[in-house]
Amino acid sequence: MRKILLAGLIMFLSGVFASAFAQVKIVTPYKDLKVKVLRCAVIEGNCVVDMLFENVGAQDLKIWSSVDFNKAYDDAGNEYNTNYENRIYFYVGDMKNNIPSFNKEINFMSEVPVKVRAELSNISEIATAVSRLEIAFWVVTSLERPTVKISNIPISR
């Protein structure tokens, strides 16, 4: 009986966590770049959004991070950008781009998932979701700044 109750509880909790991210909306400017939100949690006063980026195309995708154009907004009305009070940090794999004007080439190899993290410093205590997260990239040959836009990310505390 305990096993059945435990199995039921696990299935229920799995459904709750899966449904929490079901409302997340993701728009990417690259048709072959798939983005998945893995978790969004507050750690030591900062909101950490862990994601998985995967290039499902046949060719590698080389783009530049454009950290100085990354932005986020929480549902309490706060903006996070490259200022020093409410700052957004950006990580790709083990690379840490935490200097606002630092741009670096990123190679998303075909069929190789890459962990990406956005960290919002000093997240509001009343925020329950990241209303919008904008991760900007930079096309070297033009002035374009294609942006991955993710909306309605629930924050777990």
Regions found by a protein language model. Give the residues of each.
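Short N-terminal segments immediately surrounding and downstream of signal-peptide cleavage
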Residues: 22-41
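Detector for glycine-centered tight turns/loop "hinges" at secondary-structure junctions
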Residues: 32, 58, 76-80, 144
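Short, acidic/polar linear motifs in exposed loop/turn regions
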Residues: 57-59, 124
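Sec-dependent N-terminal signal peptides
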Residues: 4-16
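Short beta-strand and strand-turn-strand segments in soluble, beta-rich domains
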Residues: 84-103
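Surface-exposed edge beta-strand/loop patches
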Residues: 21-28, 64-73, 101-157
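Short, well-ordered beta-strand segments enriched in hydrophobic/aromatic residues
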Residues: 47-55
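Solvent-exposed beta-hairpin/edge-strand motifs
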Residues: 66-87
